[in-house]
Amino acid sequence: MTALTDTPTWQTLASLAEDVKQQHMRDWFASDTSRASKYQQTACGIELDFSKNLITDDVLKALFALADESQVSQKRDAMFKGDIINHTEKRAVLHTALRNFSGEPVYVDGQDVMPEVLACQDKIKDFVASIHSGERKGYTGKALKQIVSIGIGGSFLGPKIMSEALKPYWFDGVKVHFVANVDGCHIQDVLANLDHEETLVVMSSKSFTTQETLQNTLTAKDWFLNAGGTQQDIAKHFIAVSSNIKAATDFGMAEDNIFPMWDWVGGRYSLWSAIGLPIALTLGYDNYRQLLQGAFEMDEHFKTAPAEQNLPMLTALLGVWYINFFGAQSHVLLPYYHYLRGFPAYVQQLDMESNGKNISGDTTAVDYATGPIIWGSEGTNGQHSFHQLIHQGTLLIPADFMLPLNVPNQDNTHHAMLASNCFGQTQALMQGKTFDECYADLEGKGLDEAERVKLATHKTMPGNKPSNTLLFEQMDPKTLGSLVAMYEHKVFVQGAIWGVNSFDQWGVELGKELGNQVLDKIVNTDAALGFDSSTNALIARFRQANS
């Protein structure tokens, strides 16, 4: 056993789990009418109902003790202070500085980074104003109304999904298109109907060498030049978010149109940096600032609220409870709001890239489960497909249901139906339906006894399936910022308990490295193949098909 699993608190939780597995939530609700109010907390515009979880007061007490013993609070404070907590890359982790509205300095290696952060935000503000006012024009004098944002990973998911989620707040007159996949179909589809004279390309790559992003940007450049632009005109139509100023200027971009990035901001946390420029172009700068404000308020909540009231702490500990003591391998996110449909994919990268690790900080292989599979879809679509597995499958799959209570400019009938389905699903998962209830429902249906018993058996729902429900007054920029930051800090807490580095991604780096090696063999068709027999055969087949 490692130190974590050998602790008395871990053993207490294991014992409590065995006890809880013999109980049913429907009985808890029947015997305690205050359960819903007891297990509910509100902060930063988010109402968290966690009463439909397999928890008791004793379970929560032990989970809070686990967090204390894992020094979660101390690790949290070290992150906010700018200590080197990404130990494998020897970096601070300070995406929180990008939404720091406190007026207090934030230090990295003894230097206050806030002047740089504020200068970048001012640059974003001025740039957005110049686009929205029509002051900034293309080489023929047309206003730049079509924005093509090219990135991948955090440089794509964050801007795209935040922009989608806030569609009611879009600025009228500018349209932002997002491109990530190196599959040429994607960039071709986006560019096909655009006028190059009113198109601005935003290339987001810290190194300016990210394979997919660079190729898509080169394709956009060829499209621009073939449509009538010249190399000299590139500076008016292409800008970058990058640390590699030389590569960007060599490409043809003006140095004034290059926005900075910092090593202390990881890609999956980068939407708060200039990577979020497409969000500001989509929403307007004031709404973009509200997004940052919401995240800042969640940061303050995370730092100051006691564990029993702390939304990131509560959601993280519930996840640890199911992953490590109930064998849960996945967690499903179910936003009952069409514009939030991409949110599961955002959290998927955030969580799985952060905590998909098997080595603890002291280089010991862990002997317990870490990051779960994150997946999900918008409600009510999922009810007609994969919810069946959650209801009657053999796997325990904790769920997060999300619902804005009010939606601007929508028929109330639609929203009432949406809400009823959301709440009904949480009840059905918790309560289930007993054999006796199913058997009684079949009375008078013309079935003989054997058929009635058989069908009732198939219709029985075990229930006892855990879920959180997160309600918002409405999904505005500030609330979305708080929601994203809540999940960021949830992931941090879980990584702190498991003792893994939540801020590197060596699996991603290996994929890039091998992808480049294979590309070299595909392009250089005379080169000898030196991989395993399967990979060699796949490359040979591709060469043959494209000869």
UniProtKB/Swiss-Prot annotation:
Superkingdom assignment: Bacteria
Keywords: Cytoplasm, Gluconeogenesis, Glycolysis, Isomerase
Isomerase among keywords: yes
CDD domains given in the database record: SIS_PGI_1, SIS_PGI_2
Cellular component GO terms, alphabetical: cytosol
UniProt-recorded name of the protein: Glucose-6-phosphate isomerase
Primary localisation category: cytoplasm
Physiological role: Catalyzes the reversible isomerization of glucose-6-phosphate to fructose-6-phosphate.
GO molecular function, one term: carbohydrate derivative binding
GO BP terms in the entry: gluconeogenesis; glucose 6-phosphate metabolic process; glycolytic process
Name of the gene encoding the protein in the UniProt record: pgi
Annotated source species: Pseudoalteromonas atlantica (strain T6c / ATCC BAA-1087)
PANTHER family: GLUCOSE-6-PHOSPHATE ISOMERASE
Active site per UniProt: 353 (proton donor), 384, 512
